[in-house]
Structure formats: C-alpha cells, structure tokens
C-alpha cells in the first residue's frame, strides 16, 4: 500500500468547524483533526502520475467533508478520477498526450466541510467552482501551487478570516468571486495591482478604507457592496475608464464627495453608490458617461441640482436618486424608463422632505476638501451641509439607515446588488498562454 506524502504539502490538519456548517443556528464547537496521510491501495492503477496526485487531493477533500446531502461525491472512489462527479479532465497544456484534471465544479452542492491543503496537488486545474455550499475555514496555502487557476468561485459559503492573500500570487487568475462569506479586515493593495477581469467581494465583513490604488485594477466588473468600507471613493478609480463596465459600491459607509473623475468612466453601464454617506453635488462630468444605463445614488446626503447632461444621456434608462437632499432636477429625468425622485427637497413636488428638514440641512455648506481624499477629489459645492467624517456616524451594519435629519424609512430588505452570474459551470477557461 502506497503512502502519498509529498514534501510540498503539510497533511496535518486541524480545522475548527462550526455546527452551523451542518445545521443553521449552531455555535462553533466542532473540532476536526486529521494527521494521517492518504494511502493509495496497491490494486489501483492510474493512467499517469498527475491523475494519481489528483486522486490523493480528491480523497483528502472527501475526508474533509462532513455533510454531502445530495450525495455528489458518492462515486469519488477508484482510480478513474475523471469520472468523479464535478471533476473535469482534459489534455494537459504542456503535453496533449497526458490527461489531467482541469477543473472542479461542485456548485450548489450544499456540502459542508473545509478545503484541505492537498488540493494544492491539482496543479493543472483552471476552474475551481464551489459556490452555494457550506465550506468554512480559510483558503489553504496549498492553493499557491495552482499556477494555472483561471476562475476561482468560493461564493455563498462560510469561509472566514482575513482576505485570502494566497490568491494574489496566482499568475493566471482572472475571475475571483468571494461574495457572501465571512471574510473580514482590510483589503491588500496588491489585489488592485493584479490583472483580474472580474472581482466580487460583496456581502462579507471587510472593514477598512478602499485602497487608494483601486484605479490600477483592469477589471471590467467590480462589486464591493454590502461590506463596511468607509472613507473616500478613491480618486484613482478614474483610471479604470478603459476597462470598467460595472462598479457596485452600495451599502457601505463611504463618506466623501463624488470625485470629478467619475466622468472618465465612459464605458461604465452600471454604477451603484447608493446606501452610503456621500455628500455634495453630482459632478457635471457624469454627463460624459455615454454608456451609462443604470445609475443609483439613493440613500446618501447628496444635494444641489442634478446636472441636465446626466438625464440626457442617450442610454440611461434607470436613475434612482431618492432619499437625498437634491433641490432641482431637469425635466428629462421624468422621461426615463425607471426613476425615483422621492424624499428630496424639490419645491411643489409630492413625497418630499419637509421644508424645515431641508432648510436645516442645506443651511450648512459642504467642504469637499475636509475629507482629505486627495488632489482631484473635489466636487461642485452647493450650499448643503458641513458634515465631516468625524461628526457623521458610519453605517454600522450592511443595511445603512437613512441620513440624519430625515424621517427614518420603514424597515426594508437589503437592496439588490447588480452583478452578473458566475461563469457557466464546467466551461473551459480561455487560453492560459
């Protein structure tokens, strides 16, 4: 009987699992410990050594699963690993005569457990999709061996801890989806220097300022919604104009004016900065966002006049600007397919704030420089309120309350997050060259 114990991987594993990984509402008290190596029965014959390594990785992973309600891994035995449910095989990139495991897709399996270090033996995989399960713990260091990994989807699980920086070193990674987990702390600046195409971090517990180098990222889709980010919208994001198509920053604690460089995002089709604490006017430069289709700035403390150029954008069809302190809107806004103008300070218009509330708020000027975001982070200052980050409370939870001085709205579910679906399951990644 062969014992597989490669030197690059540590097989001793101690992982604290949560009872909630098995049933909702439990407390963390289940300790899973394993220090025995994976053994390969002598009667198993493998087509090549890479498939043998894949067998070890998958058997270790199966051991790390404590619940598989749909029995997806019941056929995970024997040497024919390419026949395992959720396992994709193809020709090796460096040798077309060698078959290897090129992807794993266990999406929507409701499997509970953790990811073992041995998964680092799957050195040929391009796709790793495990969304909508109950995996917990952290991303193992062994993932640093996955030099061909192109798509990593860990969304809708119970992973926790700091941002898994092991992904920063994956040279081929283009698609990273960590949404709907329990990751926390700060985002590393190096994340935005990485050559990603899509980045989904929404609905976690990240709490920090957004790194100032966010604009270095070449992503086409960036979703940071429903976390606890605070401070400024980094002015550097104007540099993303050539690549960015969708940006979702809603439901955080951002406090600043909107940078004038917003107008440089001329390829953006969806922009959502609702449910924050943004102040000042909408920059007139936003009238240059010629591809904009959906714009949501609801539930902030914005004021002044809505630029004529904005509602005249040819492709704009959905503009939500309710629950702010705007004092004027062009008539063209009311001709859009979808719009929301309520709870502002428009005169002689129904469903607005009271005159007293508007007067109190608008009597204090906004000083965009007080936020000290950086040069270029100015906005056109109307007469609205002087609100500094130190005096204005941060949104304490993923669903911020309405701004101060306003009548609190009735309780409502968290707002939707515009984001495209994950990549098609079992799809082959683009060229790894």
Curated annotation (Swiss-Prot):
Q: Which residues are glycosylated?
A: 71, 267, 340
Q: Where is this region: Contains the Ser-Pro(4) repeats?
A: 381-433
Q: What does this protein do?
A: Modulates cell morphogenesis by regulating cell wall formation and assembly, and/or growth polarization.
Mind telling me which PANTHER family this protein's record contains? LEUCINE-RICH REPEAT EXTENSIN-LIKE PROTEIN 3-RELATED, LEUCINE-RICH REPEAT EXTENSIN-LIKE PROTEIN 7
Sequence ranges of the LRR repeats: 98-122, 123-145, 146-170, 171-194, 196-217, 219-239, 241-265, 266-289, 290-313
Q: Which terms are listed as keywords in the entry?
A: Cell wall, Cell wall biogenesis/degradation, Glycoprotein, Hydroxylation, Leucine-rich repeat, Repeat, Secreted, Signal
Database matches in InterPro entries = Leu-rich_rpt, LRR_dom_sf, LRR_extensin-like_regulator
Q: Which residues form the signal peptide?
A: 1-21
Q: What does the entry report about post-translational modification of this chain?
A: Hydroxylated on proline residues in the S-P-P-P-P repeat.
**Any GO CC annotation of this UniProt entry:** extracellular region
What is this protein called in UniProt? Leucine-rich repeat extensin-like protein 7
Q: Where in the cell is it found?
A: Secreted, Cell wall
Compositional bias (Pro residues) spans? 395-427
**Keyword hit for Signal:** yes
UniProt region (Disordered), positions on chain: 380-433
Annotated source species: Arabidopsis thaliana
Q: Which GO terms describe its biological process?
A: cell wall organization
Which molecular function term from Gene Ontology is one that the record holds?
Answer: structural constituent of cell wall
Q: In which tissues is it expressed?
A: Expressed in flowers and pollen.
Q: What lineage is this protein's organism placed in?
A: Eukaryota, Viridiplantae, Streptophyta, Embryophyta, Tracheophyta
Q: Does the keyword Repeat apply?
A: yes
């Amino acid at each position: 009987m062969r014992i597989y114990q490669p030197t690059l991987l540590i097989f001793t594993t101690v992982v604290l699992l949560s009872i909630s990984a098995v049933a909702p509402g439990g407390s963390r008290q289940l300790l899973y410990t394993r220090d025995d190596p994976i053994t390969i029965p002598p009667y198993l014959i493998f087509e090549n050594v890479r498939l043998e390594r894949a067998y070890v990785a998958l058997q270790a992973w199966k051991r790390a699963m404590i619940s598989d309600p749909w029995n997806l891994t019941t056929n995970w035995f024997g040497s024919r690993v390419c026949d395992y449910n959720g396992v994709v095989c193809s020709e090796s990139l460096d040798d077309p005569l060698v078959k290897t495991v090129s992807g794993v897709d266990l999406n929507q399996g409701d499997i509970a457990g953790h990811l073992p270090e041995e998964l680092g033996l799957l050195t040929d995989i391009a796709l790793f999709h495990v969304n909508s399960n109950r995996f917990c713990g952290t991303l193992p260091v062994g993932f640093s061996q996955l030099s061909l990994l192109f798509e990593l989807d860990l969304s809708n699980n119970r992973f926790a801890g700091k941002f898994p920086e092991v992904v920063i070193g994956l040279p081929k990674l283009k698609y990273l989806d960590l949404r709907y987990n329990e990751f926390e702390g700060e985002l590393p600046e190096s994340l935005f220097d990485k050559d990603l195409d899509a980045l989904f971090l929404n609905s976690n517990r990240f709490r920090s300022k957004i790194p100032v180098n966010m604009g270095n990222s070449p992503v086409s889709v960036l979703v940071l919604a429903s976390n606890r980010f605070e401070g400024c919208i980094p002015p550097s994001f104007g540099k993303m104009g050539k690549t960015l198509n969708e940006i979702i920053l809603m439901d955080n604690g951002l406090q600043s004016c909107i940078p004038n460089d917003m107008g440089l995002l001329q390829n953006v089709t969806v922009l959502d900065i609702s449910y924050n604490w943004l102040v000042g006017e909408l920059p007139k430069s936003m009238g240059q966002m010629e591809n904009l289709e959906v714009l949501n700035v609801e539930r902030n403390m914005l004021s002044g006049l809505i630029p004529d150029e904005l509602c005249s954008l040819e492709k704009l069809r959905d503009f939500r600007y309710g629950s702010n302190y705007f004092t004027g809107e062009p008539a063209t806004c009311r001709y859009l397919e979808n719009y929301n103008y309520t709870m502002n300070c428009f005169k002689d218009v129904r469903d607005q704030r009271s005159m007293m509330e508007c007067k109190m708020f608008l009597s204090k000027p906004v000083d965009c420089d007080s936020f000290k975001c950086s040069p270029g982070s100015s906005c056109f200052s109307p007469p609205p309120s002087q609100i500094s980050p130190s005096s204005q409370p941060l949104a304490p939870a993923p669903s911020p309350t309405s701004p101060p001085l306003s009548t609190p709205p009735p309780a409502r579910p968290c707002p939707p997050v515009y984001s495209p679906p994950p990549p098609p399951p079992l799809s082959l990644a683009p060229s790894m060259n």
